[in-house]
C-alpha cells in the first residue's frame, strides 16, 4: 500500500512538473510574440516599401534581407509558429 501511495505521489509530481514546464513554454512564446510585434511594426513598413518599389537595388535587398532575418529569428525562437504566415507572405513569395 505504501508503494502504491509513493507511486501515485511520484506520478502526480511528474505531471505537475510537465504541466508547469509546458505553461512556462507557452508564456515564453507569448512574450516572444509580444516582443515580435515591435519588430513587426518596424519591419513591415520597410518590407512593404521595398517590395512595392520597382527594381531592386542592393540597398533595398539588404533591408528586406535584414527584416526577414529578424522575422526568421523570432519565428525560430517561438515554437508556436505564429510568424510563419508573415514570413511566407513578405519574405518568400513576394520577395522573389
Curated annotation (Swiss-Prot):
User: Where does the UniProt annotation locate this protein?
Assistant: Endoplasmic reticulum
Where does the signal peptide begin and end? Answer: 1-22
Disulfide bridge positions per record = 29-78, 80-91
GO cellular component annotations of the record: endoplasmic reticulum
Which SUPFAM superfamilies does this one have?
A: Bifunctional inhibitor/lipid-transfer protein/seed storage 2S albumin
Q: What is its main location?
A: endoplasmic reticulum
InterPro entries documented for this protein: Bifun_inhib/LTP/seed_sf (IPR036312)
Q: Tell me where the transmembrane regions lie.
A: none
Q: Which UniProt keywords apply?
A: Allergen, Disulfide bond, Endoplasmic reticulum, Signal
- Give the family per the record: Belongs to the 2S seed storage albumins family.
The protein's name in its UniProt record:
Conglutin delta 4
The lineage is:
Eukaryota, Viridiplantae, Streptophyta, Embryophyta, Tracheophyta
Amino acid at each position: 500500500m505504501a508503494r502504491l501511495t509513493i507511486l501515485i505521489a511520484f506520478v502526480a509530481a511528474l505531471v505537475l512538473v510537465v504541466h508547469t514546464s509546458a505553461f512556462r513554454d507557452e508564456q515564453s512564446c507569448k512574450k516572444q510574440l509580444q516582443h515580435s510585434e515591435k519588430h513587426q511594426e518596424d519591419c513591415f513598413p520597410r518590407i512593404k516599401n521595398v517590395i512595392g518599389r520597382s527594381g531592386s537595388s542592393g540597398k533595398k535587398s539588404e533591408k528586406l534581407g535584414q527584416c526577414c532575418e529578424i522575422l526568421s529569428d523570432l519565428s525560430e525562437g517561438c515554437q508556436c509558429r505564429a510568424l510563419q504566415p508573415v514570413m511566407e507572405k513578405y519574405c518568400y513569395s513576394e520577395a522573389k
